[in-house]
Structure formats: C-alpha cells, structure tokens
Swiss-Prot record:
Motif ('HIGH' region): 6-16
Catalysed reactions, semicolon-separated: tRNA(Glu) + L-glutamate + ATP = L-glutamyl-tRNA(Glu) + AMP + diphosphate
Protein name: Glutamate--tRNA ligase 2
Role, per record: Catalyzes the attachment of glutamate to tRNA(Glu) in a two-step reaction: glutamate is first activated by ATP to form Glu-AMP and then transferred to the acceptor end of tRNA(Glu).
Principal location class: cytoplasm
GO annotations of cellular component type: cytosol
GN (gene name): gltX2
Keywords: Aminoacyl-tRNA synthetase, ATP-binding, Cytoplasm, Ligase, Nucleotide-binding, Protein biosynthesis
Motif ('KMSKS' region) on chain: 232-236
Molecular function GO terms recorded: ATP binding; glutamate-tRNA ligase activity; tRNA binding
Pfam families, sorted: Anticodon_2, tRNA-synt_1c
Membrane-spanning residues: none
Native source species: Helicobacter pylori (strain HPAG1)
C-alpha cells in the first residue's frame, strides 16, 4: 500500500500535492491500494474543515483513494504499541520535566554543542510526581537506508537519542503515530518531502523495535524553491497554496502537469495525470531542488485551456450560449488562466465602464458620440467588419485612433486584445447585450 498523510493544519502546499500525486501514480503503476491518512492528532493546531478541504482538492485534482482513515481514531492502538515496547524493555518512562530539559538545551547552546538527551535523566525528577513521557531507547548503532532518490543516507549513533513516543498526556508523537499506522496498513513505499529525512531514522528504529521484518522504502523529494528569492517556498507564499492556484484559474490537470515536470525527465511537455502513469519513474527525478516558475505554469495552463472540449469549456466559464464557443477559443489565445478568460468574456458581455477607461474629458465625449452612433445601427445587416466600420465612422464623424480605441472599449470592454474583425461575427449576434454602458 502507498499513502498520502496530510495534516489539517493549513492550506495544502504544492509540495504536499506533489507528494500526493507521485504516491498516487506509483500506487496505480504497482496496482497497490492508495490510502489517505489525515494526521489529526495535534488537536491544538488542527483547523476545522481543513480535512474536507484537502479531500476536495484531491478529488478536484483527479486523485482517488481506496481507503480513508483519521489518525486520531487509532490512538488506542498507538498506546497499545507503546505498552508493548515498555514490556519488552525497548522503551522507558522518563520523568524529566520540560523545565529541566529546557535548562539542558540552553546549557548545550551556550557550550556550542548539539543537545542530546541522556538516559540517566529519566528518573532524576521521579519523586516530583511529574506525569512521565515514554521514550524509545537510543540505538548504539548507525541507522542507514537506501533512499529511492537520495541513494544511501546514514545517521551515526551520536545523531540519535532516546526520543519521545508518548507525551505526558499519553498522546503519540508524530513519528510514533506515523510509524504505527504505516505498519498497521502495511505501507511499502513512502514518497514525501526531504524535510522528513530527519524523521526517517526514528521511524526505522520504531519499526525495528516493533518487530517489523518488511522494511519500508523511502523516496524523499527535493524542496521547491521560490523563483525570486531562491529560498524554500513557505506557506506564506501565495503561489505555494494549491487553493490559491485553483482560485487564480489554474486547471487541476495543468497543476499536476507542472508538478510532475519540475525536477523530472518527462517525454513530452503537455500531458494528463493518466498519461503520466504510463511512463513516470522515480529514477528520473533529480536530487537537486526544483525552482517554482509561475510563468511556465501559466504556459502549461494555456496549453491545457486549448485542449478543453466544448462542454467542459462552457461549464468552466459558466457560459450557456454555445454560439460563444468560437469567441472563447479566440480569447483563450491571449489568456494564461481560466480567471483571465472569465474576465475577458465578462467584459465582453457586461455593460462597459467608460468612466474607468477614459483618459480625459475629450476621450469620454468620443466614446459617448460613438456609442450613440452604434446604438442607431443594426449590426446584423453588415456582411463584414469593414462595411460596419465605414458606416460607424460616417455616423460618428470619428476616424483613426479617435475611432478605434473607443470602438474596442465599447465592444470588448478592453483597450487591446483579439483583432476586431475576428470577433465581429460574435458581436453581431450579441450586439444588444454587448453595446451597453454601465450606469
């Protein structure tokens, strides 16, 4: 089984979605079940409704799953596994207070050495009646694993101490709950961000302590860097939020296309998630950080907009009139996102706001003069734009730039865009709706 394990503590990050996509693809390739596990054991950080938002985004992205579980439902199992380790003398109670440990951390900082928990501290404060935590006994050997992307990764014994499995309130720590559940659901491969590399030796030690004989394979994805700062994209970066990208009008298929492409060798530029299942390989992923490029994402989105079938295009733009399909196709040529396309068609069909667009009083007067001339015309009697243009010029007594700029604004709501002769047939059939001024 493969899994994607998001926490409902904020918006879904593109790095998380990338991991979800890769786990989903490999599950499909290997004909294995795909599990979604909502890691909701951190009650203080959970945000109400974020779990459903994550699931809706996954559905919208075309990612389906075979099983959905909430980690909090397994808390009794986590405690049972901790009890097992205590009985087998692989774990122990630690009574050291938070204050004591903070003092030791400060001491290590002042002495410019890494902080490492010492097992002898476990019973120093036992008589103070602190509720204990449960710790896994530190290893006396190195922990190494062969990462599917990073190759061999090794942690020496002095890099690992006796870490906490259960907190004072008997809630499981991230690494313990995560590992227990991975074993419970027989997860065989975990693809996740490289920020989890430091968690992996701890999870391997827990697996070994619990008697697992089937080692899990890990693949840690390089981080995604911001295109401007070159730093890791954080949750504060708008473009790192999948929700923001979707709201900006990026199609799910384009987002998936982009996230599969960056830091990867792909056989073609534009493809769907189903196509990627045919050829995707972890071996083709680079070990170097990927750089986010919004301009390239926009380019891919533009290509996918062009591939939309008529029915989907009408649905996504909320246009009910099939006669406007040709116009939508023309507008797509200059749009990078669905939001831009919707704005184009809205400006075309809505009353025009010349107050917003006029440069001076003279320009406003020219707009009004041309508007009055156009209102007296029956657009449908003209065989082409040229004959329409000549008559509009004659009636308005305008020509050149004084004619064309107001004309474009009155007919499209924009001062630039697709050539008017190309969209004139659509203007003709909708001119009564098109030729309106905002009050």
């Amino acid at each position: 089984m493969l899994r994607f394990a998001p926490s409902p503590t904020g918006d879904m990050h593109i790095g998380n979605l990338r991991a979800a996509i890769f786990n989903y693809i490999v599950a499909k390739q290997q004909h294995k079940p795909f599990l979604i596990r909502i890691e909701d054991t951190d009650k203080e950080r959970n945000i109400e409704g974020k779990d459903q938002e994550i699931l809706e985004i996954l559905k919208f992205m075309g990612i389906s799953w075979d099983k959905l579980v909430y980690q909090s439902h397994n808390i009794d199992y986590h405690r049972e596994m901790a009890e097992k380790l205590l009985k087998e003398n692989k774990a122990f109670y630690c009574y050291a207070s938070t204050e004591f440990l903070e003092r030791e951390k400060e001491k290590a900082k002042n002495e410019k050495r890494p902080f490492r928990y010492l097992d002898e501290w476990a019973t120093l404060e036992k008589d103070k009646h602190h509720a204990p935590v449960v710790r896994l006994k530190a290893p006396n050997h190195a922990v190494s694993f062969n990462d599917a992307i990073k190759k061999e990764v090794k942690f020496e014994p002095d890099e690992l101490d006796s870490f906490v499995l259960l907190r004072q309130d008997k809630s499981p720590t991230y690494n313990f709950a995560c590992t227990c559940d991975d074993l419970l659901y027989e997860v065989s491969l975990i693809i996740r961000g490289e920020d989890h590399v430091s968690n992996t030796p701890k999870q391997i030690l827990i697996q070994q302590a619990l008697g697992s004989n089937d080692p899990i394979v890990y693949a840690h994805l390089p981080i995604i860097l911001d295109e401007v700062s070159g730093k890791k994209m954080s949750k504060r970066d708008e473009a790192s939020s999948v929700k923001w990208l979707l709201n900006q009008g990026f199609l799910p298929v384009a987002i998936a296309n982009y996230l599969i492409t960056i830091g990867n060798k792909v056989p073609k530029e534009v493809f769907s998630l189903d196509e990627a299942i045919e050829w995707f390989s972890l071996e083709n992923l680079s070990n170097s950080p990927a750089h986010f490029n919004l301009k390239y994402l926009k380019h891919l989105n533009h290509e996918h907009l062009k591939l939309l079938d008529d029915e989907k295009l009408l649905k996504l733009t909320s246009i009910k009139d099939k006669n406007l399909l040709g116009l939508l196709r023309l507008f797509i040529e200059e749009c990078g996102t669905l939001l831009e396309l919707k704005e184009k068609i809205s400006l075309f069909l809505e009353p025009k706001d010349i107050v917003k667009t006029y440069e001076n009083e003279d320009f406003k007067e020219r707009c009004l003069a041309l508007f009055n001339a156009l209102k007296s015309m029956d657009f449908q009697v003209y065989k082409d734009f040229e004959s329409f243009k000549k008559e509009a010029m004659r009636l308005s007594q305008l020509k050149g730039k004084d004619f064309f700029k107001p004309l474009r604004i009155l007919l499209t709501g924009n001062s630039h865009g697709v050539e008017l002769p190309l969209i004139f047939p659509y203007i003709q059939s909708h001119y009564q709706e098109v030729l309106r001024l905002k009050a």
